[in-house]
């Protein structure tokens, strides 16, 4: 244990040397990489003893996942520092990008301090485990706990006086689970589309009302009455999950399609051109909302996936975007020198890179059928209201939202099986063709007969519906070939429509390395991180 701390202190000393010596170059960065590689190697051996793979539960799992996040962030910042140093080599003698270096060095320093705290907490937890705080549980984990507890009340059992105190404790726990569920949901509602906020609010009120009734009457009601009230609360929780799924997809189509309206490139151009304060404020507001929405998409994506590598990549992307969000606008506003412009270039490149990785990993875990279904709903509503929407330009936005489906099937993990199927390959090609045709006819400046536009949108709808059916068929055939058995427990019967149930515990690399192989278990994640360090150096 002491050796880990000593090695981590050595890493911190090297980073501090880079912060005070502004002429530190690649040799200094390689020195840090070597020291950090040694620490990571020692930690890997230590982790196997401290927390075997099958014992990564509770707070131990939380601390290990925090350590994985810090590893990934350190590696990300190393990559950006290497790029910064290489750019400095092309500048005039002695020119240094101090603001850029400071940004990434501060992030590495924070990660090293967090690593030290997490390693200590991990050791303490291995000696004497502590209960996991509800604040540390995800929406899905809280929902599973709440439904499992309700399941016990749905079964009528003879009353037992000796269990009264246990029952009282359990109802308190159930109420706490529901309250924390609502906290997660409210955070999501703050950035949800206006069209979803009203429905979400109504569902929250229903859940809280049913939970309050169940708690209020718990002690006075017999098991039969408790069962009836449990059966009322269960569907309210299912409704909450279902509508959050749908609202999450709506957010994905809006935030991932709306890259031009709130793009980092457009924001920089507007700030550089010194446009009116109203235009700047509007774009800044759009940008901030989009970043907040991406954060919520990431939080729920983490909740819906079980793969530790996927969670780590998403967390790292969110951490990078959050860190950049605080400094990228000032960097764009202060481009008064060539060095300031280089600083803005590096931050913009980093932001776009993290956003691309984030988008790809989200597409990796999304269920293709659920994504198509959501877009079909958007298309159907738009076709029904085409006369009102066409003059406002909304039909063009709807057609452009189809790019999210296009991007989804550009990834090998999502199209490999589809294009291997003759019908699937043909329908995918037809989808791409009609999508581009719909966008083209809506983008031209001359007026086009609305009937022609509706006809194309209906063709797009028909092709997508058939494509979804092919995806259904492929999933069914795979299930039959694998001789999959149906699950029986109450929580496993729920299928989270956001995440692809076929992913299991592996996922493609999402462009973090050149390899496309998936990691099959959690201990491989550290090896993955070490490979990244060796690749960089």
UniProtKB/Swiss-Prot annotation:
It is a peripheral membrane protein. This is Serendipity locus protein alpha. Disulfide bonds: none annotated. The keyword Cell membrane applies. GO terms for molecular function: actin filament binding; beta-catenin binding. Transmembrane segments: none annotated. It comes from Drosophila virilis. InterPro entries: Serendipity_A (IPR008837). Keywords: Cell membrane, Cytoplasm, Developmental protein, Membrane.
């Amino acid at each position: 244990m002491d050796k880990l701390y000593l090695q981590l202190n050595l890493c911190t000393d090297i980073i501090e040397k880079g912060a005070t010596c502004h002429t530190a170059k690649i040799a200094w960065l390689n020195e840090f990489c070597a020291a950090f590689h040694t620490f990571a190697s020692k930690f890997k051996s230590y982790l196997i003893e401290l927390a075997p793979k099958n014992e990564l539960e509770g707070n131990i799992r939380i601390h290990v996942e925090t350590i994985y996040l810090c590893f990934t962030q350190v590696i990300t910042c190393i990559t950006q520092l290497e790029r910064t140093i290489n750019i400095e080599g092309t500048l005039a003698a002695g020119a240094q990008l101090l603001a850029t270096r400071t940004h990434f060095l501060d992030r590495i320093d924070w990660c090293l301090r967090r690593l030290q705290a997490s390693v200590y907490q991990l050791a303490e937890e291995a000696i004497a485990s502590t209960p996991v705080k509800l604040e540390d549980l995800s929406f899905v984990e809280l929902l599973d706990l709440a439904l499992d507890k309700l399941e016990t009340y749905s079964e009528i059992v003879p009353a037992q006086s000796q269990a009264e105190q246990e029952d009282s404790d359990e109802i308190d726990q159930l109420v706490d689970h529901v309250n924390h569920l609502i906290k997660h949901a409210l955070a999501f509602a703050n950035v949800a589309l206006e069209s979803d906020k009203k429905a979400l609010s109504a569902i929250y009120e229903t859940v809280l009302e049913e939970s309050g009734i169940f708690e209020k009457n718990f002690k006075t009601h017999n098991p039969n009455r408790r069962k009836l009230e449990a059966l009322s609360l269960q569907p309210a929780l299912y409704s909450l999950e279902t509508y959050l799924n749908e609202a999450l997809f709506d957010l994905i189509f809006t935030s991932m399609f709306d890259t031009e309206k709130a793009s980092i490139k457009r924001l920089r151009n507007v700030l550089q051109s010194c446009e009116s304060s109203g235009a700047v404020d509007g774009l800044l507001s759009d940008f901030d909302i989009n970043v907040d929405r991406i954060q919520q998409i990431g939080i729920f994506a983490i909740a819906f996936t079980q793969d530790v590598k996927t969670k780590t990549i998403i967390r790292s992307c969110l951490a990078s975007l959050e860190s950049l969000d605080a400094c990228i606008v000032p960097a764009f506003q202060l481009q008064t020198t060539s060095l300031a412009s280089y600083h803005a270039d590096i931050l913009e490149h980093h932001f776009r890179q993290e956003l691309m990785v984030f988008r790809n990993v989200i597409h990796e875990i999304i269920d293709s059928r659920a994504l198509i279904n959501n877009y079909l709903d958007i298309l159907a509503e738009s076709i029904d209201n085409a006369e009102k929407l066409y003059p406002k330009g909304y039909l063009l936005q709807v057609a452009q939202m189809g790019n999210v489906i296009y991007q989804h099937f550009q990834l090998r993990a999502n199209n490999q099986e589809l294009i291997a199927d003759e019908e699937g390959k043909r329908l995918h090609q037809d989808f791409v063709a009609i999508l581009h045709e719909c966008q083209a006819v809506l983008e031209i400046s001359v007026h086009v007969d609305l009937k022609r536009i509706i006809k194309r949108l209906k063709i797009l709808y028909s092709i997508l519906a058939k494509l979804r059916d092919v995806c259904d068929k492929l999933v069914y055939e795979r299930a039959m070939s694998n001789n999959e058995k149906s699950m029986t427990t109450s929580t496993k019967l729920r299928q989270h429509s956001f995440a692809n149930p076929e992913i299991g515990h592996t996922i493609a690399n999402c462009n973090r390395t050149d390899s496309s192989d998936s990691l099959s278990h959690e201990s491989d994640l550290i090896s993955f991180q070490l490979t990244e360090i060796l690749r960089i150096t």
